[in-house]
Amino acid sequence: MELETYLPKLEDLWFRKTMLEDEETMSYNHAWGGTVSFPKDRWNDWYQYWVIEDDGQRYYRYLKNEKGVFVGEIAYHYSDFYHGYMANIIIYSKYRHQGYGREGLKILCEVAKENGITYLYDDIAIDNPAISLFLKEGFVEEYRTEEIILLKKQL
């Protein structure tokens, strides 16, 4: 399986909108409200912040499979709350269970390391099945509450 990263253009944000508004894709996000509205009138500001203003605090890319089809997104950003860089990976529901999540997480960790980041974190809902993926990829439990588990990986 071959995955490549792709820096989306503004007009490519239809894919992010599709994922965020898809109930099955966003089921992992139920602890934080599930689906997320991403209307076109918010695209410019979002794109400016995540793509144009590259200050080293954020990274965002789509994942494309060997056929050139968008299958998900990977990102990280600095969190003042956690005092560290938080991972984000979303695989569109119809492309799950095909290894894209594992490969995307590996790519994200490699990019973060290349960009000088030493630790990557993610706070995941306690019942999210993706926890096992993160643990298999070298993340360790930092702590947990009744709602979330905070995972950390030294890069």
Model-assigned labels for residue ranges:
Residues 1-40, 44:
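A short, well-structured alpha-helix characteristic of acyl/acetyltransferase catalytic modules
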Residues 92, 121-132:
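Conserved beta-strand-loop-alpha-helix junction that forms the acyl-donor binding cleft
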Residues 97-110, 132, 136:
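Conserved acetyl-CoA-binding loop-helix of GNAT-fold acetyltransferases
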Residues 15, 86, 90, 103-104, ...:
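Amphipathic alpha-helical recognition patches that constitute DNA-binding helices
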Residues 121-125, 138-153:
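Conserved catalytic-core motifs of GNAT/GCN5-like acyltransferases
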